[in-house]
Amino acid sequence: MRVGVLTGGGDCPGLNAVIRAVVRKGIEVHGWDFVGFRNGWNGPLTGDSRPLGLNDVEDILTRGGTILRSSRTNPYKVEGGVDKIKQVLADQGVDALIAIGGEDTLGVAKRLTDDGIGVVGVPKTIDNDLGATDYTFGFDTAVSIATEAIDRLHTTAESHHRALVVEVMGRHAGWIALHSGLAGGASVILVPERHFNVDQVVSWVERRFEKEFAPIIVVAEGALPEGGEEKLLTGEKDAFGHVRLGGIGTWLADEIAHRTGKESRAVVLGHVQRGGTPTAYDRVLATRFGLNAVDAVADGDFGVMVALKGTDIVRVKLSEATAELKTVPVERYQEAEVFFG
């Protein structure tokens, strides 16, 4: 059997650990051949590929990013895209695909399965917002990076007695903001799931100043003020219809400065949350996902995604994997509110 592997969507720490586990088990246990398709779905669309052997994955466990590179290519936006993929797979003798990605990549995987291509999905997103799995790799690393940044920002904020607004990733789900804010001792945490009242935020900030402390406000990029709109870096959309969010941190810092008369600055962590070495947790989770994806291919169980349920790796239908996002529930946010102000 010959199996194709690809990584789609935004990169995150742990992708290489999945690739390594897939190739190691596929070759050493089953004797399969592997081909890596470059740049997400663009690889099987155009035939851009490379062989994947044991030597190719020998030293990639701890590396961030992906040796296969990635893109946000949507083959269903390309005329004749599905037929092109089928032809490339036939030409290269590929019997099945393992697609590693988030909601968009897995949504394509589901549609390709419906169109007769054997695909197994592996969930990937630093946002941790896929509803069919308890956790996705990359999330723990992103939270660790954001928490370290918050820890460092506390000292500079206190030295100058200023407010610092830390903008983290999170388009529709505020898991990174919630976890890093709690771990980093933030004075306020703002998430997309709950539109915030600016007056209330200012009140929490002023209360912190009154206690002679410098407030740290952690805000997800998709957070919204009541009656407000998303802050966009650009109105352009990618192949899946997503706009680039950004700017809520700067906007909020300006509002705080204007309303309190106190110096306030914004810090946008941006893509640093995606980069670098994955944590031990993410390496292990990514490895387990890869091993179990190989099992699904061996069983001929296509149209599924491997997922974490409790401490077990299970399989769920791709239709279930992309059905809904996992957002921060009210009770989890209320836990964090105890520490506001």
Curated annotation (Swiss-Prot):
Substrate binds at T125, I126, D127, R162, M169, G170, R171, E221, R265, H271, V272, Q273, R274. It holds the Pfam family PFK. InterPro entries: ATP_PFK (IPR022953), ATP_PFK_prok-type (IPR012003), Phosphofructokinase_CS (IPR015912), Phosphofructokinase_dom (IPR000023), Phosphofructokinase_III (IPR012829), PKF_sf (IPR035966). One of its GO terms (biological process) is canonical glycolysis. Mg(2+) binds at E103. The active site is at D127. It is an enzyme of class 2 (transferase). GO terms for cellular component: 6-phosphofructokinase complex. It catalyses: beta-D-fructose 6-phosphate + diphosphate = beta-D-fructose 1,6-bisphosphate + phosphate + H(+). It is found in: Cytoplasm. Non-allosteric. The record marks D104 as: Important for catalytic activity and substrate specificity. Diphosphate binds at G10. It comes from the Bacteria. SUPFAM superfamilies: Phosphofructokinase. PROSITE patterns: PHOSPHOFRUCTOKINASE. The record marks K124 as: Important for catalytic activity. One of its GO terms (molecular function) is 6-phosphofructokinase activity. Homodimer or homotetramer. Catalyzes the phosphorylation of D-fructose 6-phosphate, the first committing step of glycolysis. Uses inorganic phosphate (PPi) as phosphoryl donor instead of ATP like common ATP-dependent phosphofructokinases (ATP-PFKs), which renders the reaction reversible, and can thus function both in glycolysis and gluconeogenesis. Consistently, PPi-PFK can replace the enzymes of both the forward (ATP-PFK) and reverse (fructose-bisphosphatase (FBPase)) reactions. HAMAP family: Phosphofructokinase_III (MF_01976). Belongs to the phosphofructokinase type A (PFKA) family. Mixed-substrate PFK group III subfamily. PANTHER family: ATP-DEPENDENT 6-PHOSPHOFRUCTOKINASE 3, PHOSPHOFRUCTOKINASE. This is Pyrophosphate--fructose 6-phosphate 1-phosphotransferase. It comes from Amycolatopsis mediterranei (strain S699).
